[in-house]
Amino acid sequence: MEISFTRVALLAAALFFVGCDQKPQPAKTHATEVTVLEGKTMGTFWRASIPGIDAKRSAELKEKIQTQLDADDQLLSTYKKDSALMRFNDSQSLSPWPVSEAMADIVTTSLRIGAKTDGAMDITVGPLVNLWGFGPEQQPVQIPSQEQIDAMKAKTGLQHLTVINQSHQQYLQKDLPDLYVDLSTVGEGYAADHLARLMEQEGISRYLVSVGGALNSRGMNGEGLPWRVAIQKPTDKENAVQAVVDINGHGISTSGSYRNYYELDGKRLSHVIDPQTGRPIEHNLVSVTVIAPTALEADAWDTGLMVLGPEKAKEVVRREGLAVYMITKEGDSFKTWMSPQFKSFLVSEKN
């Protein structure tokens, strides 16, 4: 099995569709049957719910979706040595490196949100991710030493990466030969937005699409109601609902520290790495959900906020006016917090 972004393959998404897969009830004669297409990409699942398409159209669309997502993976993967991203990473050149417009846009958004989170959302943290065993490298047999961490930190930093936009070509440029860009924190969000654009190109105006924990939507579901998305409780029980939201044509993404981890020397190590310390996070923030104009933005914000921890994250949320829902672990229970902007999307919440 190929895993493109995370060591744990096919993790259950921290967000899932609500009520969009059910067949129309007989009493609701106006309802339109929803077709659900599914597949695998980037070490996780993709899914598309689309009302009112027939079997032939479904088969054609599924093939187009998979082809597009395979291309996205070939663009962004750190597990494919011949991906566009890995060719940049493996190059020691400090000269401008030509990239696609999509790659330039992803990196530009990541750098912007990285700056707004005081460097907490850092796409150059790849050497540390690999050091701790959450990238293509094997898991370490012991916790890395401070010397190893410092050596990897010296190869990171958003200030070492620049996007150059010219009229007909975009470039990435690094000023450290060993700079290693890892876009796994935003790959799902970009792919979900890309799926939404594919739906539009195909003339589909009602859809809910997801890649892993990032979703995008437009229009109404099969019953003529807003698409609803459930946020999972941060437990090992799948599909346990914490809250339900109407995303109303926005992007949504959740970052969680409770699923992708391993234990070493008696310590539970999260896959979320703090660029400042070079170590997995240890605070009590276990889930961050962000609703934003695009899934890419939501995916970038949720990572940065997760790294910051609850109090610093709240400061950024208030300063930037973000729609955010956070869950912290308090002893044996969980506590939730949401920004005023998030409340307008909330349908229900469970204690």
From Swiss-Prot:
Binding-site residues, Mg(2+): 185, 299, 302-303
S-diacylglycerol cysteine lipid attachment residues: 20
Cellular component GO terms held in the UniProt record: oxidoreductase complex; plasma membrane
Domain of life: Bacteria
Keyword annotations of the record: Cell inner membrane, Cell membrane, FAD, Flavoprotein, Lipoprotein, Magnesium, Membrane, Metal-binding, Palmitate, Signal, Transferase
Gene Ontology molecular function: metal ion binding; transferase activity
Catalysed reaction equations from the record: L-threonyl-[protein] + FAD = FMN-L-threonyl-[protein] + AMP + H(+)
Lipid-bearing positions (N-palmitoyl cysteine): 20
Membrane topology: Lipid-anchor
Cellular compartments annotated: Cell inner membrane
Cofactors (names): Mg(2+)
EC numbers for this chain: 2.7.1.180
InterPro entries: ApbE, ApbE-like_sf
A Pfam family of this chain: ApbE
Binding-site residues for FAD, renumbered to this chain: 42, 79, 120-122, 182, 188, 273
Signal sequence, renumbered to the chain: 1-19
PANTHER family for this protein: FAD:PROTEIN FMN TRANSFERASE, THIAMINE BIOSYNTHESIS LIPOPROTEIN APBE
Oligomer status and interactors: Homodimer.
Xref: NCBIfam families: PRK10461.1
Function text: Flavin transferase that catalyzes the transfer of the FMN moiety of FAD and its covalent binding to the hydroxyl group of a threonine residue in a target flavoprotein such as NqrB and NqrC, two subunits of the NQR complex.
Identification of the protein by name: FAD:protein FMN transferase
Lineage of origin: Bacteria, Pseudomonadati, Pseudomonadota, Gammaproteobacteria, Enterobacterales
